[in-house]
From Swiss-Prot:
Organism of derivation: Arabidopsis thaliana
Family assignment from sequence similarity: Belongs to the PDCD4 family.
Primary site of residence: nucleus
Single biological process term from Gene Ontology: negative regulation of DNA-templated transcription
Annotated region described as Disordered, given as residue ranges: 25-60, 673-693
Comp. bias regions, Low complexity: 683-693
Summary of the knockout phenotype: Increased susceptibility to dark and starvation, and to treatment with the TOR inhibitor. Decreased translation activity associated with altered ribosome patterns, especially in the dark and starvation conditions, in which mRNAs distribution is altered and rRNA abnormally degraded. Slightly early flowering time under long-day conditions.
Annotated function: Involved in target of rapamycin (TOR)-regulated translation control, especially under energy-deficient conditions.
Protein name, per record: MA3 DOMAIN-CONTAINING TRANSLATION REGULATORY FACTOR 2
This protein's encoding gene: MRF2
Alphabetical keyword list: Cytoplasm, Nucleus, Repeat, Translation regulation
Length: 693
């Protein structure tokens, strides 16, 4: 991912750029604590930051330097119970030991396991503080190790609010740190800048903390130095990442290449001890399913190596090097790609079935946890050739859309490629759209949301797309460590845009092959948390700069968009050009909100009969061009129906006029013949029952 100047690189709270290797598939924190942890993460829900278009950070009413949050330093409110003090004291001792051992061994997995075993997730902010403060007084090697460990633990082991709080404590204690560490201001400034570059801290952290600290404090010096000396310079991301010599950690592609190399060397030599050493050296236990997958594919391709490779997998499981979950996932990924594999290995299905039978009989695979290899009779499978052709075309269409922003062109292209029965292809398109957007800037993320809303795909297809995205989240996390947060935001946005209903969230989880997986549960729970937040709709809409994708504007509030619609209709009705009015509707950049154009147009028709034909022409042009979909048209009419009672105060015969509008809408093809004024009918029924009473 590209890193730009600070003012250009700010991202939403749930969209974080590439780290090297993430432990996103590590075992999650106990499920019982998940709801509480996610509730605490609301302190990072999107908000507006003064003087910028930034939308993430910590809400003003949750002051992280307030004494209520300061329970470990003794300079604020502290729990009076001795139990609390004992727990915290014990945690401090063990955290110090864990950090010391980590600096000696560089064993990330050991740290993960020890923190989980230690528990007490509410104190993990102290681990962040202790890790950084101890590294500050050591060599560059330990500083780099600390920065890498924080990136690895972020979100999976240490929740974002705890990381934020840990850095808050560090900055607040900069004066004390400077007593023992002469260059504490500079070193801590680099740590803060590195955390922002690695996206484990939001850029809003700087301004937020500056407002809370005394102007003459060392903490303010740290924040200013981080901003001006490290984050405001050209190529700042690269400079910050290499400040302490960089790391020898690898990207996803590096890991895959190393896995291939170790398997090839093992096939040639048969040296299991060396293979085990190489697997341990990768230090990516959450990615061991890739070893299983690649070993199985290599065994299919090299018949003579089958026995040796299967024997390697068996022993890695017996000695506990690869756990059963990773084995199951590796086999499942092969099953998912069996159709593609069959193009190169004609009897791939038969060979894989024999591998499954052998592994199950030897006791190192639970075959019952795998999907069936036989084609699902209830779902029409796509021809491999046509599916592959569509995937390539889909990527091309999406990339072109990100450049042009032309939704109508995408609709036209998909109309050509798809038919009514192409449910699987529609899901694939949405999956690729969101996947490509997640690796780009806020503008493309916003454009992806707009396009999903505009396409009007059936909810079932969109649910399938998100299920596929969740299923592949562990792999995506290697390049995007916060894929969970990204997917949660995309899901929440789909609900706000009414592409999905709130009840569809659970269905997404149920459709995921690994139903009940920790990743799926995290995504769904986080999406629900986002949707429950105060003013969630507007926040989610504005998170990626909602509105004005063609002008790349920072976004508009719902109120501002309504005002723009009102103005463009007034100008058009008073003699404006039809083409200009259509252009203005398009440039709103919020096709999911076009029902408001329909609503206001119909209301004006009811109120000003002499201008109705001009407004009908505008609606027809917008509808025929695809600018307003039948879904948005129907929703607009329904919203007028819901407001008839208020409208009748100014226009006594509003209900009658609206009925005429509905008939005209059906005649023009805007509305389905089944459209009925449900609210009006219920009001009539209520009225008749009350009058009879």
């Amino acid at each position: 991912m590209e890193h730009q100047d600070l003012t250009d690189s700010r991202k939403d709270p749930l969209c974080i750029s590439q780290l090297k290797i993430s432990s996103s598939s590590l075992d999650p924190l106990p499920q019982a604590n998940m709801a509480e942890d996610l509730t605490k993460s609301r302190r990072h829900s999107p908000i507006k930051v003064e003087g910028s278009e930034e939308t993430w950070g910590v809400e003003d009413d949750d002051d992280l330097t307030d004494p209520i949050f300061d329970t470990i330093e003794g300079n604020g409110h502290s729990d009076p119970t001795s139990c609390f003090d004992a727990d915290l004291s014990e945690y401090k001792k063990k955290a110090t030991v864990i950090v010391e051992e980590y600096f000696g061994t560089n064993d990330v997995v050991s740290v993960v396991n020890e923190l989980k075993e230690l528990g007490m997730a509410e104190y993990r902010y102290y681990f962040v503080k202790k890790l950084v403060s101890m590294a500050m007084d050591r060599h560059d090697k330990e500083k780099e190790m600390a920065a890498f460990l924080l990136s690895t633990l972020y979100a999976d082991v240490i929740d974002p609010p705890e990381v934020y709080r840990g850095f808050n404590k560090l900055v607040a204690s900069a004066d004390d740190l400077s007593v023992d560490i002469p260059d504490a201001v500079d070193v801590l400034a680099v740590f803060v800048a590195r955390a922002i570059v690695d996206d484990i801290l939001p850029p809003a952290f700087l301004k937020k903390q500056m407002k809370l600290l005394p102007d003459n404090s060392k903490g303010v010096e740290v924040l200013r130095k981080a901003e001006k000396s490290y984050l405001a310079t050209p190529l700042h991301a690269e400079v910050v990442e290499k400040r302490w010599g960089g790391t020898d950690n690898w990207t996803a592609e590096d890991v895959k290449a190393r896995i291939n190399d170790l398997l090839k060397e093992y096939v040639m030599s048969g040296d299991k001890k060396e293979a085990f050493r190489c697997i341990k050296g990768l230090k990516v236990p959450f990615f061991h399913h890739e070893i299983v997958k690649r070993a199985l594919i290599m065994a299919m391709e090299r018949r003579k190596a089958q026995v040796r490779l299967l024997d390697l997998l068996k022993e890695t499981i017996e000695v506990g090097l690869i756990n059963s979950t990773q084995v199951t996932k590796g086999f499942s990924r092969i099953i998912d790609s069996i159709e593609d594999l069959s193009l190169d290995i004609p009897d791939a299905r038969r060979i894989l079935q024999s591998f499954i039978s052998k592994a199950a009989s030897e006791g190192w695979l639970c075959a019952s946890s795998l999907k069936s290899l036989s084609a699902d009779a209830g779902e029409k499978l796509l021809e491999n050739s046509s599916a592959n052709v569509f995937k390539d075309k889909a990527k091309s269409i999406i990339r072109e859309y990100f450049l042009s922003g032309d939704t109508s062109e995408v609709v036209h292209c998909l109309d050509t490629e798809l038919n009514a029965s192409s449910s699987q292809l529609r899901a694939i398109f949405v999956k690729y759209l969101i996947t490509l957007a997640m690796d780009r800037k806020k503008r493309e993320k916003e454009m992806a949301c707009v396009l999903v809303s505009t396409l009007g795909f059936p909810p079932k297809d969109v649910r399938s797309a998100f299920s596929m995205l969740i299923e592949s989240a562990d792999d995506t996390a290697l390049d995007n460590p916060v894929v969970v947060e990204d997917l949660a935001m995309f899901l929440a946005r789909a609900v706000v845009d009414e592409v999905l209903a709130p009840r569809d969230l659970e269905e997404v989880l149920n459709q995921t092959p690994e139903a009940g997986s920790s990743v799926g549960e995290k995504v769904i729970q986080m999406a629900k948390t986002l949707l429950k937040a105060r003013l969630s709709g507007e926040r989610i809409l504005r998170c990626w700069g909602g509105g004005g994708i063609e002008t790349n504007s920072p976004g508009s509030t719902v109120k501002e968009v309504k005002e723009k619609i009102q103005i463009l209709l007034e100008e058009y009705v008073s003699g404006g050009d039809l083409r200009e009015a259509s252009r203005c509707v398009k440039e709103l950049g919020m096709p999911f909100f076009h029902h408001e154009v329909v609503k206001k147009s119909v209301v004006r028709i009811i109120e000003e009969k002499e201008n109705e034909e001009r407004l009908w022409k505008l609606l027809k042009v917008c509808f025929d061009s695809g600018l307003v979909t039948i879904y948005q048209m129907t929703k607009g009419f329904k919203r007028v129906d819901e407001s008839l009672e208020d409208l009748s105060l100014d226009v006594p015969d509003a209900a009658k006029k609206f009925s005429s509008c509905v008939e005209r809408g059906k005649l023009e093809g805007f509305l389905d013949e089944s459209f009925a004024s449900e609210d009006s009918q219920s009001k009539k029924q209520n009225g008749s029952s009350s009058s009879s009473g």
